[in-house]
Amino acid sequence: MKIKYFFFIISSLLLSNDLNQDQLNKIKKITDDIDLAKDFTLSSVKEDSLYTLSIMKDKVILINFWATWCGPCRMEIPDFNDLYKKYNSKGLNILGVSISDTKEQLEKFLKVYEINYPVLYGNQKVIDKMVTDYGGVYSIPTTFLIGKNNKIKRIYPSAILKQYDPNMYSDLVYNIEILLSE
């Protein structure tokens, strides 16, 4: 709905060159939140605490939608651990959001796979709503890079693997560094 409204506004803008500053400000206000990451609150497996996106608005956030049964998701973990180790103290938070696993399944998984960043879960209705709010996650893994003030800066709709796709990995690192410097 917002996208259609956005295009309507842009079309109107292009057809009319007589907009004053007040009208331009109204258009900007209406369209500002189109690329905002939707707020959520999910539980952390390891810390047994809650994570809310809006509380982290002064951080750069990498949200990785994944599942324990997903092979490429498992392959990303070491690279994300490295990114977390390198950039967490500089303001990057990585959140692994499980799209289908229970807390018990995740605890069992974490006994085998070392994940240094927070792994989040929620009941399936909450997760499904989050996936919908983020425009639908059509494949996993899917990763969202979110800048300060919760603006979505980049979406990676596949595995980000340093070894197998160094260009995508370099793009991610480049964008993280830019966002951290803002």
Predicted regions: what is each one?
Residues 75-114, 124-131:
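Structural microenvironment flanking redox-active thiols in thiol-disulfide oxidoreductases
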Residues 4-13:
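Sec-dependent N-terminal signal peptides
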Residues 112-115, 122-175:
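Thiol/disulfide oxidoreductase modules built on the thioredoxin-like
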Residues 57, 65-82:
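Conserved redox-active cysteine motifs that mediate thiol-disulfide chemistry
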Residues 63, 95, 120:
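Rossmann-like NAD(H)/NADP(H) cofactor-binding core
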Residues 60-61, 141:
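Alpha/beta-hydrolase fold active-site loops
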Residues 19-53:
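N-terminal "domain-start" segment that seeds a small globular fold
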Residues 56-59, 89, 115-116:
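Active-site acidic short loop of glycosyltransferases
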